[in-house]
Amino acid sequence: MLEIKLPVSILREDKKYIAYTPVLDLSTSGKDYKEAKSRFEEIVDIFFEELVKKGTLGEVLQDLGWKRARTKWVPPMVISQESQTVEVPIS
């Protein structure tokens, strides 16, 4: 078993909660915060199980920006998460 710290954003959209991690480009939802977090753990487990089963773990993680450090995989570091106001050409 490998333990990895993943950055996770929890968003609320109407009555659903969305859990998203940019380092795996993976998301899931739940009816509340707790369910979104629980489902996130499940989807990460499934994601890694499938990569190992298919033999594509290294390839996919490299494509997502992960680096191999000896016997471990290290995710890219999220250095900022913030709200930014932008103007879009929609009237």
Q: What function would you assign to each model-found segment?
A:
Residues 1-6, 38-91:
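Short, charged, surface-exposed hinge/linker loops at domain edges
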Residues 4-23:
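Short aromatic-glycine-(Arg/Gly/Cys) micro-motifs in beta-strand/loop hairpins
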Residues 18-21, 34, 48-49:
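Compositionally biased, intrinsically disordered low-complexity regions enriched in proline and serine
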Residues 21, 27, 43-47:
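Generic alpha-helical hydrophobic packing signal
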Residues 24-35:
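A short, exposed loop/beta-hairpin motif centered on an aromatic-Gly-Thr core
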